[in-house]
Amino acid sequence: MRLVFFYSTIMKRKLDHGTEVRSFPSGKKPCPSPTGLPFPATPTTFRDFRVNGQRRRITSIQPPTGLQEWLHTFQSWSGPEKLLALDELIDRCEPTQVKHMMQVIEPQFQRDFISLLPRELALHVLSFLEPKDLLQAAQTCRYWRILAEDNLLWREKCKEEGIDEPLYIRRKKVIKPGFTHSPWKSAYIRQHRIDTNWRRGDLKSPKVLKGHDDHVITCLQFCGNRIVSGSDDNTLKVWSAVTGKCLRTLVGHTGGVWSSQMRDNIIISGSTDRTLKVWNAETGECIHTLYGHTSTVRCMHLHEKRVVSGSRDATLRVWDIETGQCLHVLMGHVAAVRCVQYDGRRVVSGAYDFMVKVWDPETETCLHTLQGHTNRVYSLQFDGIHVVSGSLDTSIRVWDVETGNCIHTLTGHQSLTSGMELKDNILVSGNADSTVKIWDIKTGQCLQTLQGPHKHQSAVTCLQFNKNFVITSSDDGTVKLWDLRTGEFIRNLVTLESGGSGGVVWRIRASNTKLVCAVGSRNGTEETKLLVLDFDVDMK
């Protein structure tokens, strides 16, 4: 029965897509068809399925008169006419005659056609199966299990899911002769289990990282197993995401830290003391202090060896983090610069003068001033093609970076859009109106609004998303998990006891397996700390 099920599954997908598969839902594609191995021609009659030695002959009687003429007439009919004739014929058969037909037909559909194909072609056929069906197919028979462990087959499945690293496991059990372990299959299974943990795994007690006393954590970075928190207490702290220990405290700023970036062993911070500092994360040493701004450094964006900083002095500066040299100064805004994006080629800035500007940093030229917002610009996203800006005027605007034209104005939020994230034309925006929206920036359509009975009860403070989930935090003291595709609420990941009475989740950062939350309060009801939740699985 398993063989019948999987053949029907494969054939259905084959029929759905046609002989040449031109498009796949969710961007999925099968393994490339092996060169020079076309699919065998579809049998024209049931006789083509049967080996002569397997045919059941009734030799006890002579063929009735007119049988050949009747068969010739049957062959001349169309497909629908043949089906009608068979229906009428079955209605006139006795049970023993129907049983005879079943004994002839059923064995032919229980044959393992996959085992008759060349290995390359069999793998191509199996590539049409979803991973869950492929795992079930491995239980069908020994040969199918060998095929279903093929590493290249699972590599393609991993690519479809955005998994780019195989997983090598030291197994205690000896694998049976003839079977090989697929690292790509292990990687796929691990990711599936991690996703399940996020959705419904037991929420273990988080690691609690206490620091910064009762001050506000203003910025948060998370890379590898290292967490960096910046605070208005003038310091940054470097933490181990594994042990929860504070590895070092970065002391040197004489004002609150309001922005930071991190890459590898380099940390960059911006402060109300009007400077940026470049730190060695391993040693805690301050490598450079970058002087030039005349007011608070409010935002920054790091790309390779350069960082662009935006300040309340209305300027932006481009710095070389290796030498500490200021390479360029971008002047043109007439109010504080609140947000900046930099892709190595273009700088995009948003400011309290209601403007968004696109710059060529090498020539210090403003290429476009994007006008349209009627209040302060607080958030930006830039993918090299589109600029997306969020404003206190409640709107979000999508711009063409080359022409400066406004492509779409996204309306629906009721207050300040404080945070956004953009990936592959999907934008997720968080707003002070307590809602989160998912947009398609190509069409300007709002795909989902994350609301309902489980929605946030106060302003959304931070968000992050991947191909499956949206994670949001709020002034209401909760961190929520949502389904990206459906917009459905999944569950609360964090709920502060002081939520609703002052407890706040200021910032969140997530990796594939961990969630870091910066929490505290403005009225002393919640101690300032970091919470680290782990969703990893043990594949030993």
Describe these PLM feature segments:
Residues M1-P107, L153, K159-E161:
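Extended intrinsically disordered, low-complexity segments enriched in serine/proline/acidic residues
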Residues K210-I217, V251-V257, Y291-V297, M331-V337, ...:
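WD40/WD-repeat beta-propeller blade N-cap
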Residues G230-D233, G270-D273, G310-D313, G350-D353, ...:
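Conserved strand-to-loop turn within each blade of WD40 beta-propeller repeats
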